[in-house]
From Swiss-Prot:
Organism: Citrobacter koseri (strain ATCC BAA-895 / CDC 4225-83 / SGSC4696)
Record-given protein name: UPF0246 protein CKO_03380
GO BP annotations, alphabetical order: response to hydroperoxide
Pfam families assigned: H2O2_YaaD
Positions of transmembrane segments: none
Taxonomic superkingdom: Bacteria
InterPro entries, sorted: YaaA
Protein family: Belongs to the UPF0246 family.
GO cellular component, one term: cytosol
Amino acid sequence: MLILISPAKTLDYQSPLVTTRYTRPELLDYSQQLIHEARKLSAPQIGKLMGISDKLADLNATRFHDWQPDFSPENARQAILAFKGDVYTGLQAETFSEADFDFAQQHLRMLSGLYGVLRPLDLMQPYRLEMGIRLENAKGKDLYQFWGDVITDKLNEALAAQGDKIVINLASDEYYKSVKPKQLNAEIIKPVFLDEKNGKFKVISFYAKKARGLMSRYIIENRLTKPEQLTAFNSEGYFYDEQASGKGELVFKRHEQN
């Protein structure tokens, strides 16, 4: 079973590390090509392209400039511990045991605009380059054209390595668009999280993102290997709704939080 999640814009390079183990990202040659393109942009151009403040644009211009491919624990950090958005609040990798990291390293993949596909223990240097950004490059007008089949091929490699044909899609649409489902040698299962608001169940972005992290953690902690095992997920009040599920979707609901 291979779990896909999105990265986060918020990064943490300060907290104490809970593991000293690390691996190197497998697609750094591609990352270097993107860095080459990104370095051509001035801070104001970055700000406009990404829709961010001058301060953030300056920070990311500096990050692109400082980026270099010789990753070490001194200048980089394991991806699963560097990302700090809502998904990662639910995942809480800072409380993982070494055995949890082992399982995650095999079964969890983070999709990334700059790094393509990251394993949990892959070192990464700080960056901001969302998959939906229209960064022109030698292969086309945006990152989807840049990555082409590369991400899908990498995921197929991971599936073959574990002798498995199930993908659990917990990534956002923006990131999942970088995957070509028809070329993926897998059955794709998409958990959907609905929260009750004014008597109606719907996707509430903040809660749904955190729930994707909670589900990832649930799979990792319990060493789950079959999609039907996911239906027992009940973290933070969610419950499986069999009637609402179907067509590759597992629907989980939660009553209004008081």
